């Protein structure tokens, strides 16, 4: 039998108090509706180093979104020194715990570090976690570079 809502005039005072307490508890339980993400993902292009495979690119990433990110991945475009797109690839930054800074390194096979003139964050291909919207990982991304290579979105 489906449950029915009763008009408040039919509830006793104790019943109304019990309903108010239950509603308050439900709103504070994990998994209840959460506030939208308000912070940022700070992504720094830290270094490009020659490696046995080609070029190793290092990023420092800080999750300041106010919640854990179960998975973040970005589509990256590499441009040569002449400004031409050399390749598109997806870099999976995996899990990013809230208020944690991590270093992520990626080996780019057959890439010449010295030939890379610009790294563009084209889009977020994955943005997963409780309370996150699909576009949060790109909209709230702050990109900086310690390298001579131009980096941004």
Enumerate the language-model features and the residues they cover.
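Intrinsically disordered, low-complexity Pro/Gly/Ser/Thr-rich segments with frequent PxxP/GP/PP motifs
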Residues: 79-117
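Bacterial N-terminal signal peptides that target proteins for export
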Residues: 2-18
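Asparagine-centered strand-capping/turn motif at beta-strand->loop junctions
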Residues: 59-66
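Short acidic/proline- and small/hydrophobic-mixed sequence motifs that coincide with surface turns
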Residues: 68-71
């Amino acid at each position: 039998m489906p449950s029915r809502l009763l008009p408040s005039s039919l509830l006793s005072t104790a019943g109304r108090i019990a309903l108010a307490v239950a509603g308050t508890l439900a709103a504070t339980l994990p998994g209840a509706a959460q506030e939208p993400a308000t912070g940022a993902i700070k992504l720094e292009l830290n270094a490009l180093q020659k490696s046995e495979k080609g070029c190793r690119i290092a990023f420092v990433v800080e999750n300041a979104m106010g919640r854990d990110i179960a998975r973040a991945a970005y589509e990256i475009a590499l441009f040569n020194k002449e400004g031409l797109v050399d390749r598109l690839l997806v870099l999976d930054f995996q899990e990013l715990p809230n208020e944690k800074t991590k270093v992520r390194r990626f080996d780019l096979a057959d890439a010449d570090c010295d030939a890379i003139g610009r790294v563009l964050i084209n889009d977020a291909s994955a943005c997963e976690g409780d309370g996150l919207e699909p576009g949060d990982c790109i909209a709230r991304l702050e990109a900086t570079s310690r390298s001579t290579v131009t980096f941004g979105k």
